[in-house]
Amino acid sequence: MDLTLLWVLLPLVTVAWGQYGDYGYSYHQYHDYSDDGWVNLNRQGFSYQCPHGQVVVAVRSIFNKKEGSDRQWNYACMPTPQSLGEPTECWWEEINRAGMEWYQTCSNNGLVAGFQSRYFESVLDREWQFYCCRYSKRCPYSCWLTTEYPGHYGEEMDMISYNYDYYMRGATTTFSAVERDRQWKFIMCRMTDYDCEFANV
């Protein structure tokens, strides 16, 4: 690579990823983007879990109308900051049915640490489950919804959380019966740095 180009790009990369510095860990990037890098093939089920003590911080997907109007998926995880502690329990949430819109957050104030999905040829759509982890008795606050991903049905999707102190707690999706595709809005929340008494927020 030309050294001039490297010196131009290096400060940009440093600024973009420097926001993760408070974690005290390096950012665990996506798997390889090649065909072998996706967690699933089209029309195939999958189960993806972050390593213990990490949560999902990025979601990438491409749509293929010829392959059952399905998507291939890729995720990136990052360790939670030491102030949050270790996860005290993890579980799979209830299934969100294929062919329907849905809204779900992790119960018990959990954070999203994985996804599980199965494809249904009959509706050209997937059912979804979140893998959630709870961190002691920490509670979410200052929650908000991201913009829609993808921006339009059928487009590539690339969501990265650049706010290091916000965590994914769930999502809401629309479903187009015409396009056989979904748009996602992810639910992002901050977490208290102390234990609280709320069972679920």
Curated annotation (Swiss-Prot):
Disulfide bonds: 50-77, 90-132, 106-133, 139-196, 143-189
Modification note: Sulfated on tyrosine residue(s).
GO biological process, one term: negative regulation of cell population proliferation
UniProt cross-references to InterPro entries, sorted A to Z: Dermatopontin
Start-end of each Sequence repeat: 26-79, 70-75, 80-135, 125-130, 181-186
Keyword annotations of the record: Cell adhesion, Disulfide bond, Extracellular matrix, Pyrrolidone carboxylic acid, Repeat, Secreted, Signal, Sulfation
Secretion signal span: 1-18
Subcellular location: Secreted, Extracellular space, Extracellular matrix
Subunit structure of this chain's protein: Interacts with TGFB1, DCN and collagen.
Family of the protein in this entry: Belongs to the dermatopontin family.
Entry function: Seems to mediate adhesion by cell surface integrin binding. May serve as a communication link between the dermal fibroblast cell surface and its extracellular matrix environment. Enhances TGFB1 activity. Inhibits cell proliferation. Accelerates collagen fibril formation, and stabilizes collagen fibrils against low-temperature dissociation.
Name of protein: Dermatopontin
Organism field: Bos taurus (Bovine)
